[in-house]
Regions:
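Transmembrane beta-barrel domains of Gram-negative outer membranes and organellar outer membranes
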Residues: 24-145, 157-158, 170, 202, ...
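Outer-membrane beta-barrel biogenesis signature
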Residues: 24-64, 211-213, 290-300, 398-431, ...
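Outer-membrane beta-barrel translocator/channel fold
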Residues: 26-30, 90-118, 122, 136-140, ...
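Outer-envelope beta-barrel architecture signal
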Residues: 59-63, 74, 84-86, 129-133, ...
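Membrane-embedded beta-strand positions of outer-membrane beta-barrel proteins
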Residues: 63-67, 78, 88-90, 119, ...
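Residues on the lipid-exposed face of transmembrane beta-strands in outer-membrane beta-barrel proteins
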Residues: 65, 76-80, 117-121, 151-155, ...
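Outer-membrane beta-barrel proteins
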Residues: 82-84, 120-127, 157-159, 220-224, ...
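N-proximal, solvent-exposed amphipathic alpha-helical segments enriched in charged/polar residues
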Residues: 287-335
Length: 704
């Protein structure tokens, strides 16, 4: 141990405690609670001190983007608090002392980039007498540069937060204590050193094995609210770092954190010889929203005005679109009901859309109408019927009740066949066009760390009948650096058909390409059953024919369906030709929103993938109050990690963003930002141009 460093650290700790006592004497209301700003991030991302993690968690829905720099390493990371008990971190590391490869013609002078994923679970929440307890796994699914496991305790007293932990792997490299698990079982005494497979595979055989180290620290909230100070004692000796053996003059690290609104800046001194700094931006995924310019809701009087007929039916029809975003196909009035058939075009929030529509109608509604029925369509499919109790809604909308609840004044159900038969609903036919922005991105490439391609998808189609249409889309590239590619196809000898690893050939063939062109048939088979069939050029790399059936009740947390497709690989030499490779692909698709994981959807696709491998793709999606959805997926098939190649199995992450977060007026629709660490040929599904689960989203809103 470096005693000079130890004495300095101990002196610093005494100063912190004495300062805390003086400050706390004037702030007795602090009690045992830690009076702090938002939890701060450690160097590699995730809530912690400097090099060591703690048991602390951010509030649920917090996303933090981090950049840190400490001489040999640079880190870019994103930490997301999915639940109050689960923290996840994805990270890229720049190892400045090592080249990306030994071949300048392949990667130039670029330095080594490595990716990693961390998770931390809270096992026990802090109470007055008990500390907070957490367990974590760092870099557990990558190449293992910082692979480690830890158990951490955190306990606050006044304006000081105390932390103690034990680490294995990278965090325990110094071996300053005995591994307690070694006393239980001999296999825990030695940590396996081999790299499993092709990387990307969870090294569970290493968990909590080998040398262990204790680490500890304190975080002090100064009387000046934006400033916090940190002191830690770490358990790593940096003897086996990827950047080379690093000199460590002290195991004490000190740092300061300054918070300005949602941005924090930190400065630290590590290993007794290295200065580091970082910048961090926090975003609340629950409350993030864009102020909107939208018309005021129509006032509702209670009791209702007495009238025998509509005061001004034309006014209703005009205001349904301008005030409520509802495009009316047709309407029908019976003895005690007013029925509207149409599309919701602008309002993503179903409750707001329903309230606006009902308010518009009630301003002119005859007194004898007891219920308003709204049949909402997607294309030509009637998906959901809302039955609004007029009297109950009028009281809630006029705030006649102490705690008005608009949602309790209407029900959602499958459209009633007798109600559908009352009106001759005009179906959408004819030409239609559209355009949307696309952005393709890739991280960690040998040519450049960040590579991108952006432009427009230009779509058009013709609806021939209620059920059949022909659709097409062209891809126009406007901005890219894919012209820096120094190879189109890797030289690996893969036993799998190259169903996706020709990707560079496809995306660089031309600035203007045909993305898809296909015929599409859809129909509602029963109250909760939907079907579709399609054929043509289905996606960038494949064409063929397919069909899908889906069972999805209204507002159910469960849906099930299947799809079956026969496809052939498209040529990357032109838009129209095909290669010889063909196959069947299809899946049983299960969609489940478990009650024990609020605002979460699990999707299981079980079947055969494009490379004729068989298995399951599991997709986890978490929605936040703002409408932002964060998801992750992994495909496990009968292809071994050696056959698959680098990455061991298909996995990826995505961020789904509602358009109206960036718009000043209400808008529907979404954009998706994917991150795929490694894309190989195993576990790859067909990118079908239309999916029934998306087409029927209004029946059980998850993304809206």
């Amino acid at each position: 141990m470096n005693y000079k460093g130890f004495n300095f650290g101990a002196s610093f700790l005494v100063l912190l405690i004495s300062g805390s006592a003086a400050f706390a004497s004037d702030n007795e209301d602090l009690g045992w609670q830690f009076n702090a700003n938002k939890p701060s991030q450690m160097v590699r991302g995730g809530v912690g001190l400097i090099q060591t993690p703690t048991a602390r968690m951010s509030s649920a829905g917090t996303m933090t983007a981090n950049y840190t720099d400490n001489e040999e390493y640079r880190f870019w990371s994103v930490s997301i608090q999915l639940f109050d008990w689960l923290e996840t971190t994805a990270r890229y590391t720049d190892v400045r002392t090592v080249n990306y490869s030994e071949f300048p013609g392949f990667s130039g002078d670029q330095t080594l980039k490595d990716k990693g994923i961390d998770v931390k679970f809270r096992l026990l929440q802090e109470s007055r007498y008990l500390p907070q307890l957490a367990v974590g796994f760092n870099d557990f699914g990558g190449t293992g540069l910082f692979e480690s496991e830890f158990i951490a305790l955190s306990k606050a007293w006044g304006n000081i937060d105390f932390h103690l932990g034990m680490g294995w792997g990278y965090l325990g490299a110094a071996g300053n204590t005995l591994n307690p698990l070694c006393e239980i079982r001999e296999s825990f005494c030695t940590r396996p050193g081999e790299t499993l497979g092709q990387g990307g595979k969870i090294s569970y055989t290493k968990f909590f094995k080998g040398p262990a180290s204790l680490f500890a620290g304190v975080e002090y909230q100064t009387p000046w609210h934006p400033l916090r100070l940190k002191l830690e004692y770490e358990g790593n000796d940096y003897s086996r770092d990827r950047a080379g053996e690093l000199t460590q003059d002290s195991r004490w690290n000190i740092g300061a954190v300054y918070q300005w609104r949602d941005v924090t800046f930190d400065l630290n001194y590590q290993r007794g010889n290295t200065l580091g700094f970082g910048v961090h931006y926090q975003l609340d995924l629950n409350s993030n929203d864009q102020p909107k310019i939208k018309p005021a809701m129509r006032p509702v009087a209670s009791p209702r005005a007495q009238r025998d007929d509509f005061a001004n039916l034309n006014l209703i029809l005009n205001q349904l679109l301008s005030n409520a975003g509802f495009y009316l196909k047709t309407s029908k009035m019976t003895d005690d009901e007013f029925i509207l058939y149409g599309h919701q075009l602008f309002y993503r929030d179903d409750e707001e859309a329903t309230e606006r529509l009902a308010r518009v109608v009630l301003t002119q509604l005859p007194s004898h109408i007891k219920r308003i029925r709204v049949i909402e369509f997607s294309g030509n499919l009637p998906l959901v019927e809302k039955v609004i109790d007029v009297e109950a809604f009028a009281k809630a909308a006029a705030y006649d009740e102490l705690q008005p609840d608009i949602r309790s004044t209407y029900i959602r159900q499958t459209p009633d066949k007798s109600i559908m038969a009352l009106a001759d609903v005009p179906y959408d036919t004819g030409f239609y066009t559209g355009a949307e922005i696309f952005w393709i991105q890739s991280f960690g490439n040998p040519e450049s760390f960040y590579m991108y391609q952006g432009g427009l998808f230009l779509g058009a189609g013709y609806r021939f009948t209620e059920n059949f249409s022909f659709n097409g889309a062209a891809k126009l590239t406007l901005l890219e650096n894919f012209d820096q590619f120094n190879f189109k196809v890797d030289a690996l000898d893969t036993p799998l058909p190259r169903v996706r690893t020709f990707a560079r050939e496809y995306v660089t063939r031309s600035k203007l390409t045909m993305e898809n062109a296909y015929g599409h048939w859809q129909k509602q088979l029963g109250d909760n059953w939907f079907a579709q069939a399609y054929g043509g050029y289905l996606e960038t790399m494949f064409g063929g024919v397919g069909t899908e059936v889906l069972y999805r009740p209204v507002d159910s947390n469960f849906a099930v369906g299947f799809d079956l497709n026969y496809v052939r690989q498209r040529s990357f030499e032109n838009d129209l030709d095909f290669f010889d490779y063909n196959t069947f692909t299809g899946h049983i698709n299960l969609y489940w929103q478990p009650e024990f994981l609020p605002d979460t959807r699990l999707t299981f696709n079980i079947g055969q993938f494009l490379a004729q491998d068989k298995g399951v793709n599991v997709d986890f999606a978490k929605r936040f109050d703002s409408g932002i959805v964060i998801g992750a997926y992994a495909a496990i098939t009968n292809v071994s990690s050696d056959e698959y190649g680098e990455g061991s199995f298909t996995k990826g992450f995505y961020l789904s963003l509602p358009f109206d977060l960036f718009a000043v007026k209400p808008a529907k629709g979404r954009g998706r930002l994917p991150w795929v660490p490694i894309a190989r040929d195993g576990g790859q599904p067909l990118n079908r141009p239309v999916k029934l689960i998306d087409m029927t989203e209004a029946r059980s809103d998850f993304y809206n």
